Amino acid sequence: MRISCAIVFCVFTFCYLYFYQADILVLTQHLASNGQTHYVPFLGAILITLVLQLCQIGVNSLLKLSKRGYALTYFPPVLLLTILTAISSDVTTSITFGVWAWLAPLLLILYVVLVLYVRHYEPYEPEVRGVGFISRLLWINLGTMFAFFLFVGMFSNSDKHFHEKVKVEVLVHNHKYHNALRAIQQMQNVDSSTTMLTIYSVARIGHLSDSLYEYCLVGGNDVLRPGKVHSLLLPDSVINKATKNSIHYQLTGFLLDRNLPKFTRFVTKYYPVDSIRPRYYAEAYKLHTLLTKGLTPKPPYAKGSYTHYYFAKK
């Protein structure tokens, strides 16, 4: 029974940390250490799982529960696991315990009262029949374990949008720009900071002037560089240093704000001949020419085109 509970706990904890909360823990450690240390998902999941299992062994050595209440010795490590992955979706620059600052001590007090009660009456429990996987004792304890796992799922961070956003942050931070852009395309909603990382990623792969508007963009020129928005992982200085002298960033800023008159004045300095202008620059220049003549392109506008972005709801 003890071995079965340990296996179930370790498998759940490792899978939960490695497959579901890995990106969240990367962000948590980054903020907690002020960017001085980096969380490695596979190694971190193994180490945290081992530490939590050792915590359970320590708790059981004190309580010495061996019957129906044995699985209760897993509550302290389950509580630690929950708090570790309960980072707020509104986090910006630092980690706070929030409600857990008072809720965790309260739960531990209630836990101590419960286990003392269980320990007091454990000698009087009737023997449970069955051995191995047909043992009633095993399934009672596994039921308690599953209730604990449900507790983890309910009170840790399970915000889908936040998970998607942090995944993009981690991929960009690790220079996996193509993967980040694929993740962004799968997001149902994007915010201004994700838009900034979208522009940065497209620029890093060299397609700012021919594929940027295939992605959802919000915020206009304000999200081009850090200022009003910031990345959770990537320092502002990294983005600014990589883009401060970029002609494409300057022209893209005009296009994001739909400022075609200013765009046309600058684009002719860098691309005087229409035939050498990249896709969006040529399209925007032609669009400006039509608009100055009082003409408007007929909808529908092709998705991924600058014209579609220009006439989209502002």
Question: What kind of feature is each model-predicted range?
Answer:
Residues 132-159:
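Internal/C-terminal transmembrane anchor helices
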Residues 13-19, 76-87, 146-152:
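Aromatic-anchored segments of alpha-helical transmembrane domains
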Residues 110-112, 213, 217-234, 291-314:
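Intrinsically disordered, low-complexity, charge-biased linker/tail regions
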Residues 157-264:
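Soluble catalytic regions of membrane-associated enzymes that act on cell-envelope
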